[in-house]
Amino acid sequence: MSSKDKKPSKPSSSRGGIRTLSDLNRRSGPDSDSDSDGPQEYYTGGEKSGMLVQDPSKKDDVDEIFNQARQLGAVEGPLEPPPSSRSFTGTGRLLSGENVPTGNQQPEPVVHNIVFWSNGFTIDDGPLRKLDDPENASFLESIRKSECPKELEPADRRAPVHVNLMRKEEKCPERQKRRVSFQGVGRTLGGSNEGSGSSSPVAPDSAPIPIQTEPAPSQSLVIDETVPTTSIQLRLADGTRLVAKFNHHHTVNDIRGFIDSSRPGASLNYQLQTMGFPPKPLTDLTQTIEEAGLANSVVLQKF
């Protein structure tokens, strides 16, 4: 058979690279490949921010958010941000012992995961938020416009922000509270608490393991649900991770008070700083969460 009789080969529909919007919006026909059965994922962003959008199947309010983000420039991309350069970055030292200053280093990207559930949405490990809540209108409008919401902007304006949007059909699961074993002293009905069976405290089930938990807020910390709230992840020096809820007008000192109330008797000689590179020390205790750009951020405890 001559080369003129050969039919042109059908282009492959590889999902590995970035596609144009015409490729993404093309409806699948009878001859479409089988890999188009799953939900499409789109990535939008630039030098300073990025967003991955997974196209859902149901038509509802969340559909509108995903579709508008796609229409404003979303393209298919990976869920995680591209890996940073593996080249050495650090401080040089001459043979004479003097340090050589290095150039400006690109801050690490800040990643936020927004999950849309059937009963609302969550940001990272924060509380469930309602789609019809007027307080969330500005946040959702930024998502529709493929923009980084203001409350997710990092303290370091040079740091790129990657916002991953995910869709789950089930309801957001309720958080399980940590069960604490009883460690008191038993007392018999006769009034005597002597004896090996009642005088010794009950041993815990196992050694304490730092887990993510949310202790009761301090007496001085009052959350006003009528004004904007935010969740801040606190990574303590012992490895424990706490997620605390604050109002935007709360201060850095209120964050310290929350940590101190969760660790009574612990040393108070520590410093708080934002996560990122370079880390930003939070030395002004009167600075509000909004002023410091700490909404939905991660704060580290350092001794």
UniProtKB/Swiss-Prot annotation:
Annotated SEP domain residues: 109-173
Residues of the UBX domain: 225-302
GO molecular function annotation: ATPase binding
Domain of life from the UniProt record: Eukaryota
GO cellular component term, pick one: cytosol
Region called Disordered, residue ranges: 1-107, 170-220
Subunit structure as annotated in this protein's UniProt entry: Interacts with CDC48A via its UBX domain.
SUPFAM superfamilies cross-referenced by the UniProt entry: NSFL1 (p97 ATPase) cofactor p47, SEP domain, Ubiquitin-like
PANTHER family tied to this protein: PLANT UBX DOMAIN-CONTAINING PROTEIN 4, UBX DOMAIN CONTAINING PROTEIN
Keywords (A to Z) from UniProt: Phosphoprotein, Ubl conjugation pathway
CDD domains documented for this protein: UBX_UBXN2
Keyword Nucleotide-binding listed: no
Protein name (database record): Plant UBX domain-containing protein 4
Annotated organism of origin: Arabidopsis thaliana
Gene (UniProt): PUX4
Phosphoserine modification, residue list: 181
Pfam families assigned to the protein according to its UniProt record, in alphabetical order: SEP, UBX
